Amino acid sequence: MSVESFTPTALQFTQGAAHKVKTLVDEEGNDRLKLRVFVTGGGCSGFQYGFTFDEEVAEDDTIVEREGVSLVVDPMSFQYLAGAEVDYQEGLEGSRFVIKNPNATTTCGCGSSFSI
């Protein structure tokens, strides 16, 4: 009998996303704020992404740090986000945080919901 260890695939936090988080945190004047990314049921494809700023970090949260700011994900959401990339984009549709998720089999046109 063999035992295999499992290391979860990291969640990528791009420089562009980290820079935007830093800008927003600096504007608020609260360096305890972290960007929390989560997955909930809903949207046109079954699951949807959410973003919020949070001062609290739970013991079992995954934390990704870059440029002095933190991205936080709860364990339930992380199972859907392992290997994904959190980025920030500016375009004709406006500015927003986006997730490029290799686990998603389909995504909606706006990119905020997905299915696995």
UniProtKB/Swiss-Prot annotation:
Binds 1 iron-sulfur cluster per subunit. InterPro entries: FeS_biogenesis, FeS_cluster_insertion, FeS_cluster_insertion_CS, FeS_cluster_insertion_RrpA, HesB-like_dom_sf. Keywords: Iron, Iron-sulfur, Metal-binding. Its cofactor is iron-sulfur cluster. GO terms for biological process: iron-sulfur cluster assembly. One of its GO terms (molecular function) is 4 iron, 4 sulfur cluster binding. Pfam families: Fe-S_biosyn. Iron-sulfur cluster binds at residues 44, 108, 110. One of its GO terms (cellular component) is cytosol. PROSITE patterns: HESB. Homodimer. NCBIfam families: iron-sulfur cluster assembly accessory protein, PRK13623.1. Belongs to the HesB/IscA family. Required for insertion of 4Fe-4S clusters for at least IspG. This is Iron-sulfur cluster insertion protein ErpA.
